Amino acid sequence: MKKNRILSIVLALIMLPVTAFGAIDRKEIDSANAKFQKTKAESGELKEFSRDLNLVIDKVDVTKVLKHKPMAINGSTSVALRDFAERIGAKVTWYGHARMIGIEFGKSHVLIPVDKKAMWVNGKIIDMKIAAKIHGKTSTTYIPLRNIAEALGYKVDFEEESFTARLTSQQKTK
């Protein structure tokens, strides 16, 4: 009985780093964070659209199943990151020590710092026009839709008339 308990504890401790960091390891997070320190910070405000934005992913309208409505940051369409990522089947992890979100989707590994105009995509820094922001009332992180969608292999089209963003997968995830 005592051996089983000790074995369980040892296995849990061995697996902790794997489950906590998945395919994005601490070294990669620290490396990205060091590079993000050189990136310009931004102060943009989240604002609601005057009308509801429709979001269609691979021909499926997900507008009504989103927990948080898309919003605008400095005029750029932004989505709640976890909400969007979960709709496409991506894994999301918050790295509080670095104020950074990690996303794993197929072969894509993305790290997104809050309030920085850049993201880390498969080991490369990609500049963004707008930084990811945390909505004060809901503690939800918003990121420009086009940036995250393209980083995860989606083509983005916007239809002004119907106020619809259409995302089409351009890669196989498995």
Outline where the language-model segments fall.
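Sec-dependent N-terminal signal peptides of Gram-positive bacterial secreted proteins and lipoproteins
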Residues: 2-23
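Primary recognition of N-terminal secretory signal peptides and signal-anchoring hydrophobic helices
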Residues: 5, 21-174
